[in-house]
């Protein structure tokens, strides 16, 4: 997988497009293939260390995104591989894949593209 990685929270010009191992979802998580992500003002603040949420470095920014479930972790029974979901998690959206807690996901209709 690839992701915009923040290793130094000094702004977007320091983000690096980085190849990373594809993660495995843990208990209560799904692995999401990101299909679309938005760029919001909090995303800009987070990568400058100016937001109230300060993720541990390094991290993949991107707070709002949508994608397709690729794998489900233990304890996740209401989401299935191939299902389309929207996510609001705070981080992870600026990568091709991300593990995310099922509590941050909402399924959306297949007619939405």
Task: Name each model feature, range by range.
Residues 103-110:
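Conserved small/polar residues in nucleotide/adenosyl-binding loops
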Residues 12-17, 50-51:
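Short gly/ser/thr-rich secondary-structure transition/capping motifs
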């Amino acid at each position: 997988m690839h992701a915009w990685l923040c290793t130094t929270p000094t702004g977007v010009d320091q983000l690096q497009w980085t190849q990373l191992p594809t993660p495995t979802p843990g208990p209560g998580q799904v692995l999401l293939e990101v299909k679309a992500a938005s760029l919001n003002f909090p995303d800009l603040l987070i990568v400058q260390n100016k937001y109230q949420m300060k993720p541990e470095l390094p991290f993949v920014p991107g707070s709002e995104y949508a994608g397709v479930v690729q794998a489900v972790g233990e304890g996740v029974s209401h989401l299935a591989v191939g299902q389309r979901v929207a996510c609001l998690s705070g981080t992870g959206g600026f990568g091709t894949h991300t593990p995310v807690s099922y509590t941050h996901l909402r399924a959306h209709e297949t007619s939405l593209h």
